[in-house]
Amino acid sequence: MEFVVSNTNLRDLSRIFLNLSRIDDAVNWEINKDQLILTTLNSSRSGFGKVTLTKKFFDKFTFHPDTLFLTGFVSPTVRLSTQIKPILSIFRNKIFESTLLVNNNLNTNAGAAESSSKKNVVVENIQMQITSGKECRVIFKFNCKHGVVKTYKIAYEQTQTLHAVFDKASCHNNWQINSKILKDLIEHFGQKTEELTIQPVQGRVLLTSFTEEVVHNKDVLKQPTQTTVSIDGKEFEQVSLNEGIIITLSLKEFRAAVLLAESLGTSIASYYSVSGKPALFTFNKGKFMEIEAQFILATVMGPDDFDESSLGARWQQSGTANSSLLVPENTSAAPALENEAPSASIGWQTNGDAETSRMFHSTLDIPRNEEPAAKPSRQTTDEENHPLFLEGMPDETELMAFDNDVADDAEFGPTQHEQTYHGIFSQDDTET
């Protein structure tokens, strides 16, 4: 199997991996004859990210089913999993080596002409190949000008992937906004802030975070801090919200969705029903939707949730409206909203055969005696002990450094315009 990504889409691909790494340290690949799907699920099963790249995203898309994958039979879909940190290392190592060569040449009197040529060296395309057999690797080949080829190999393991079952048509609260506006607003919240509350109030939407008192090592915050930013209703391209519905979710995963949408230059849309039920954040890029992303996050259930008296006016506004419209909520509609909420819950199902698949259902109350599902053991080889095969989540400093390098590096070409989470997934032992 071989996939070729042009210089034009290289930056988008790097940002996809970067923001998926904010959710978990592993990324699942699902490949069929029409598309490549990248997914990641965090350890607490409270956040999920999915990015679909269609054939039109690639300059070349060659898919060959492998008889050695999973079932032992020819399958129309290939599924595998890789650590995401080595993939980030590939891009960062390439950027670092390129910058180092330029800086060294600038420090020599005789190397001015050579450094100028180095600056003009760009990656023309990337070839991604997947091999099986004795050497199971995902191979990245960076084809640069002047015949320079940089090759990196990442080990993978066979896996079963999960896909969301989310009925956004049943979500009565939704909005859409330019992701650049949202990115500028969430920069007011600290990197270590865990939660974010979204609340509509009188034609505006409030984003609120609360940081408790912290006295730990070098982190000292003597007083609790609450930060609130307000979004005017006119900033939304479309909005339809019940003012009594307030949701609280993880800021880390929410930030990943917003930053990816902003880097792609798209608007981001959100769908949710009530607090305690998952929220969907989605966006796409391209005339033919070459890139489509979905982030599904668990929300925290507060003590006053599902209180009919808390439902206020319903606020609706479209992009063509000159002003927001406040519609008094029909008192008989509140119970209906509560009754319909469960249909907006999210489930997960493996993509295996129907007779062997399992369903993972949304839940917020996990029995105390239930142990979280352990990750499958991972076999390692001597080659995987190489520094390139690093495991674990990259910290925020590494992610910011990578993001800055991608933004500044000429090789990427032009920019294209725990309150505790119980988790939204618990495994149902009954096979369907």
Curated annotation (Swiss-Prot):
The keyword DNA repair does not apply. GO terms for cellular component: checkpoint clamp complex; chromatin; chromosome, telomeric repeat region; cytoplasm; site of double-strand break. Belongs to the rad9 family. Coiled coil: none annotated. One of its GO terms (molecular function) is protein kinase activator activity. The gene is rad9. Residues 363-389, 409-432 are annotated as: Disordered. PANTHER family: CELL CYCLE CHECKPOINT CONTROL PROTEIN, DNA REPAIR PROTEIN RAD9. This is DNA repair protein rad9. Keywords: DNA damage. InterPro entries: DNA_clamp_sf, Rad9, Rad9/Ddc1. The keyword DNA damage applies. Acts in DNA repair and mutagenesis. Involved in promoting resistance to ionizing radiation and UV light, as well as regulating cell cycle progression after irradiation. One of its GO terms (biological process) is mitotic DNA replication checkpoint signaling. Pfam families: Rad9.
